[in-house]
Amino acid sequence: MRLIRLATLVATAAVGAAFCGPALVRAQPRCRAVPKEHPRLLGSRERLQKLARQRAKAYQRVVSVARKRKADDHSKLVSMALVCAIEEDRALGRQAIAKVLKAIAGPIPRGHVPFAHTLGRCAIVYDLCHEHWTAAERKQFHTFMNRTVDANVRSETHVFHNGWYGYKTWGIGTACYATYYENPRAAAILDAVENEFRTRAAPALELAGAGGGWGEGYYIHYWLYEWLFFCEIARLCDGTDYYAMAPKFFRSRAVAGMFEMYPGISTYGSRRPIPMGDGGGRVFGGDRDKALAARRILASLYRDDPAHQVVHAFNETTPRFSVGVYAYKDFLWRDTTVKRGDLASFKRSHFSPGPGYVYARSAWDESATHFFFTCGDRFTAHQHLDVGHFLIYRHGELVGDGGHYDGFGTPHDVNYHLRTIAHNTIRVYAPSETWPNIRAGRATGNDGGQHHNWPHHNGAVTDAATWTKGRRLYDIADMLAFEDHGDWLYVAGDCSRAYSPKKLDYFTRQIVYLRPGTFVIFDRVAARRADLKKTWTLQAMKRPQGKGAMWTITNGKGRLFIQTLLPAGVGVKLFSGDELYRYGGRNYPPRRNTGPAPECRMEVSPARLAKVDYFLHVLTATDASAGAPDEARVTTGDAEVHIAVGKAKITFGKAAVGGSITLNGKRQRLAARAGTSR
């Protein structure tokens, strides 16, 4: 094997590789045990016919979509192809082929468009309806496939970004398996796909996806299902195991994905994923079904693992996809032969060190309290400037992500939505600080937040090797501690490097979660100068009610009590209505509404400026009918801060991260560094 640049392969008819960047490529395509007969992408005809008998109800819904119902192109073509293969229905196959021929007769897609979906669904029709294609039609598809590959050598090259997987590669790989032996270039292109994944994408998944979370955030729900669809095709066709190339990600992804769902079953029997960066899923969409399908594939794959048996039990609480024309996903991926684990007794928190995510719940019932905390590094475009940010949910969001994703690089996006001001973390205002253009949008606002000092305007890095080379730029945070003791959970993060060193010495955040609903949040913040104002920011779903140090947020059936214990004598400001998106004398309203978002920004600042400040808050999530909790009590000394809340007594150190907790007569240390993000 020799190291070459894949971009140069387009010029060679023998390979015609689809990618750009270094990868190992054999001079001759490797010998693969791909079946020569069709269908093969989803197994043999006999396998599909057996599935139709085993999953008869789901299959009949597929038949209805294939023959009667209106549907999007993807669902329609996949359903038609499945029924054609299972029932050997030539007429239906020819209808599907006619749709494909129309799709591939147009201009060759290129650039940041999801051409993988076109390739993927057309390839599925090619394979499952293979005997009904004429030789000339097959050649026409080969030409379309090869020209699409060649046109997109330099498209979607960043492997921390959803586009590499969902817009590009899954479709190319699927088309290669469908046309193997018949398209002279398919074998070499498929080798390029595998080697690109092995040498660039897998290391990225291991780095930014260790523990099953993903640094890009919510966008994982937009691409993971399609990528797993391709991984299953590879496994079925020739035994290639893409999962084994990135085990730190794949073996934990289903569990992390389960924790990424808010409690409660909502629109059309779906579960809403938590907001992480761009996206956010505030209103119902097909991404919810994609998330379920991805968990189903992984639960079936790792069926002998007890944790995945619990995931299967969780999946079965929403046994049917919400979108009716997605019946083919139920048919293909709902595997009821997996043993159901005991969901109620499963762990109630999960740490994903790659992206620096901690997820926690009070229980596994639908009325549980849900908590999310992020303190991780920079990888790609759809991340926000949100290190130290957290979410709290009970019967609905209580504190969330501010702003609206009204477009990529809009004035609202780059001055509010992705900025620190729209998140539940700390801001330090230096009057002279400026931000470069972000996402090709003009950043005019000084929100006092985290920096955006990366070479690419998106803040993106191409792959793990480039990230490691530029680690001093992209390694901006550390998850210092994570421990769950049942009644309480403790996390600690160092957020310091996410800010300009010209204004901040350090910012550490420690959170003790006392189940079921109390959160003690202690922040140590040291500015470079005493005159730099510090602000503790909270994005409230509804305008808080109260005064002084005690406030209440009520959203539907949920309520959050907020107690500010430090600094003493704080100033509290609320920004809502026309003032919500205004700061620094400018207003940055969104161009469109993306669904229910925080309606008020709460800002807490010390009454007196100082170089070092300590912020201490107690947040208690309850039912809306619950009365106020007992007031927490705080005492401060030269070296420590002591707080009594309920039955717990907690101590935090002032000079460094760490402390102790005493609960039910048992004293335990709060670790200063029990786990790290790398």
Indicate where each model-derived feature is located.
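Bacterial N-terminal signal peptides that target proteins for export
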Residues: 1-11
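Cleavable N-terminal signal peptides
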Residues: 13-14, 25
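Boundary at the C-terminal end of the N-terminal hydrophobic targeting segment
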Residues: 20, 25-29
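Acidic/polar, glycine-enriched structural segments that form the non-catalytic walls/loops
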Residues: 28-63, 130, 489, 540, ...
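Aromatic-lined, polymer-binding surfaces characteristic
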Residues: 32, 38-41, 48, 52-55, ...
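Carbohydrate-active enzyme catalytic cores, enriched for enzymes
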Residues: 179, 222-398, 605-615, 629-678
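Catalytic and substrate-binding regions of extracellular carbohydrate-active enzymes
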Residues: 319-559, 563-571, 579, 609-624, ...
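Extracellular adhesion/glycan-binding regions together with long Ser/Thr-
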Residues: 592-607
